Amino acid sequence: VIVIDALGNGLSTSPSNSLAQPGARFPRIGIRDMVQSQRLLLDHLGIEKLHAVVGASMGGMQALQWAVSDPVRVQRVVAMTPMARTSRWSQLVNELGRRALFVDQACTQPRARADAMRLWVPLTQLIVPSSSEALEDFESATALGQWLSDKAAWFGEHGPDAYDWLAQTRAYDAHDLGATPGFAGDTNKALASIRAPALVLAPEIDLYNPGWSARAAAQAIPGARYLCIPSDRGHQAASGVKAGDVAWLDAQIAAFLSQ
């Protein structure tokens, strides 16, 4: 099992840890760049075949990119809550997140940390990744407000770095499998090139990566199987927040990988 931190996440090469190109000087990257860096790592390790590439959210988008970019190495692909081309809705969500973190439109001046987190946390940690049903878990409006305050304080101390968020969300926004060389911007043509058996999973309602986008991607991949995740957690259906969702996903993925 190989788990790789994507470029820009603050652990692999990122604006927050780059010595040569820190902060606003960090170059723009794309999801295809993330996958290419992972391919180079596997070349270095001498790994020629992957039994499966599995990912959720941006990881699911990377999984589909893997299947397009390296069809010889990828033997199976499991993409949870993915998009083959980033939706306008997702781009809007990311833009609102960036405006919460930065004072100026050019994204060169981060807001004061506490101010940024008061705006950023409700949007990115609760409203968008969750669902209206999930919010009913809070006993009262007071409990919800306290959760937001606690989360804002935690993120204010622990992250994210504003420039890391900027780099990754810009990569997110620019993603389109059709931009892979050889497909002339045709997303469906890129999806149709996937030869590995593919399993695509997404909940019915996802306020970050729309469920229709995952379904459309699955329909364009030859022989792909699409499964609707029976979850009320929205985008977090594939993030491990609910034990029942984890058990269901484990069973479906295990069955797929055993074929």
Predicted regions and their residues:
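Conserved hydrolase catalytic core segment
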Residues: 49-91
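Conserved acidic catalytic loop of the alpha/beta-hydrolase fold
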Residues: 32-52
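Conserved alpha/beta-hydrolase
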Residues: 1-16
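Conserved alpha/beta-hydrolase "acid-adjacent" motif
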Residues: 207-213
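Short beta-strand/loop motif that positions the catalytic acidic residue
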Residues: 194, 200-202
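Active-site nucleophile elbow and catalytic-triad environment of alpha/beta-hydrolase enzymes
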Residues: 151, 167-190
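Alpha/beta-hydrolase-fold enzymes
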Residues: 73-155
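Catalytic active-site module of serine/aspartate enzymes centered on a nucleophile-bearing elbow/loop
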Residues: 215-218, 223-259
